[in-house]
Structure formats: C-alpha cells, structure tokens
Amino acid sequence: MVLKQRANYLGFLIVFFTAFLVEAVPIKRQSNSTVDSLPPLIPSRTSAPSSSPSTTDPEAPAMSRNGPLPSDVETKYGMALNATSYPDSVVQAMSIDGGIRAATSQEINELTYYTTLSANSYCRTVIPGATWDCIHCDATEDLKIIKTWSTLIYDTNAMVARGDSEKTIYIVFRGSSSIRNWIADLTFVPVSYPPVSGTKVHKGFLDSYGEVQNELVATVLDQFKQYPSYKVAVTGHSLGGATALLCALDLYQREEGLSSSNLFLYTQGQPRVGDPAFANYVVSTGIPYRRTVNERDIVPHLPPAAFGFLHAGEEYWITDNSPETVQVCTSDLETSDCSNSIVPFTSVLDHLSYFGINTGLCT
C-alpha cells in the first residue's frame, strides 16, 4: 500500500514539474485574510541591510564540476527529477568529510521532532480534525491543538498548538498534497515583499500565507499574551516550509516581545522563497533558522538559484541514506557546500522521507 502511495505521489510530482511553465492566474485573497486587523509593522524590524550577499548562484560550481546529466534522465530547469546514478564527485560530496561539522545527537533529535510535527500535519485527523490520531502522533499528543486552518483557494493548511511541558507555542504548516497547493508552487514569478522595501519573494508562497495570515497571527499573539514566557517555534515541510518562513518573519515584524531569543524556525525540504536581498534580510533578523535537506531532494533547489532566488538559514543535510549522518553548513546564507554540492543529480523521491519519517503522506 505504501509503495502504491509513493508511486502515485511520484507520478503527481512529475506532472507538477512538467507544468512549471504554466503561469497561475492571480487569485484574490479571501476577505478574512486582509491585513486590516493585524498589528502594525515595527519600522525598525523591516529594513533591509545595505550589504548584498557575495554569492548569488551557489549551485554554479557543482553544476560545472559534476558535469551534464545522462541524456536519458528526465530534468526540469537543469535538475534531475530522479537520477539513479551519479559521478564520483557526487559520492564524495555526500561523505561527512570536507571540514563541515557533523550535527550532534541532540540537534538530530530536535530536528526529528519538528519533522514529525510537519509530517503529522498531512493527516486529515490532525488538520483540520484537530486530534492527534495518526501513526506518528504519539510523539506530539501532549500538545494542545488550539486552532487549525484549511483554506479554500490555495488549500493552505496550518495549525497552532501549545506544549506546556516544553513551554512552546507551535505553528505548523502543511506542505503540498493537493492540486491547489501545486498551483501555488508552479510559478516562479517574483513579486515585491511588502514589509521590506527592495526585496522580492515567490508570489505563490506569499499568497498562500496570506490566506491564513490574519487569523493565524491573531491566534498566536493571543497565546503569546497568555503565556509570555513561552517560546514560539514555526515549522513546515515543502511548501509548508516556505509559508513557515514568511510566518516567522511576520510575527517578528509585528510583535516586540518576539526576537531571536524566543522565536525559532525549522523547515524540511523547503523551496527557495526570495531573492538575495530577501535572504540577506532574513539573516539580519537573527531568528535561529534550521533548514533541513534530505540527501538529493530536488525541492530545496527550486526555484533555481540561477533564477535569482537564494536560501537563508543554516543547512542541515542528511546524507548517506542515514538519519544519523547529518552535515551542518553553518553559514547563514546557502553556499556551494552541503546539498548544493550534488546538483544537478537531484531526486523527487528524497523529498518523501526525512529522518525515516514519511513526509507528504499520512503513513
């Protein structure tokens, strides 16, 4: 059954990547997603740094070094959909050598927990059902689900939960598991990021977050007002990781009480969200940002860096088909190391499992 689900999901993903050239029709946000009732932006937290990243295409060295893909490998934007073999340079890159530190067991346990939260969000019993009734739910059943969202246009799914033993307010965004989600994914159209002048982000991701922004921010800030000593952690897989990033920034920009000391961001298999100026702004906030990539997962390499997009956040790269083998690229902006070292030999299948947990399927 699981193999059948994986095959169906793989087929759908291939259709999705084939459809990338189709431009989505602009869709108006729902009336309850306006920003009218949101707290005002804090001017001192919405200024882009004057400096620019020194590297804007960190994938270029590996694209040149690893050579062209075999002619029989299906590709999109120069990346393999499912390369099954790769040159020695890629094998070497996936070893733990090379001066990049290994993640500690404590870090791996932490990342696994947030991956479990993200994976559980794919279960309808959790979102919108608001009950911990799923295969991995025993790991999160002590959390109280405050509210869930499942919107009509982009099918944005999210929840706010509270862990009293951990003293943490959790915000979890589901990734793509429906055609409507892929509509949000399939355009690479950059648009101005309204809070920060001079920066641009992926239009679909911005619109997806906009569908839940108003109510979600109000819910989180209400919880934070009741529990001001709690930290706030935002997480999501795939598209959910992209919206998680926008959410974390939104909270930082509107709530003085949230800062780098109590606001945290964890993503898994997250696509690139914005341009280099946006990535530089993300770094300037100081928000601890742990971005996990599984082996040769293609999604973190989209939209391509060559298209003017760049990741922020420390990269935690799962290698050698082992959840216990995780490299950490400690740079706040992505570099040519870690997962960028293996392009263009990427894979859709590696998007479906993180730390041995099925992501994208409620299994």
UniProtKB/Swiss-Prot annotation:
Q: Where is the composition biased (Low complexity)?
A: 43-62
A biological-process GO annotation: lipid catabolic process
EC number, as in UniProt: 3.1.1.3
Provide the disulphide bond pattern.
Answer: C123-C362, C134-C137, C329-C338
Q: Does the keyword Iron apply?
A: no
Q: Which GO terms describe its molecular function?
A: metal ion binding; triacylglycerol lipase activity
Q: Which residues bind Ca(2+)?
A: D350
Which portions of the sequence form the region Disordered?
33-69
Protein's UniProt keywords contain Repeat: no
The alphabetical list of record keywords is: Calcium, Disulfide bond, Hydrolase, Lipid degradation, Lipid metabolism, Metal-binding, Signal, Zymogen
Catalysed conversion reaction:
a triacylglycerol + H2O = a diacylglycerol + a fatty acid + H(+)
Q: Which residues form the propeptide?
A: 25-94
Instruction: Give the family, as the similarity comment puts it.
Output: Belongs to the AB hydrolase superfamily. Lipase family.
PANTHER family associated with the record: ALPHA/BETA-HYDROLASES SUPERFAMILY PROTEIN, FUNGAL LIPASE-LIKE DOMAIN-CONTAINING PROTEIN
Protein name as annotated = Lipase
Give the organism, scientific name: Rhizomucor miehei
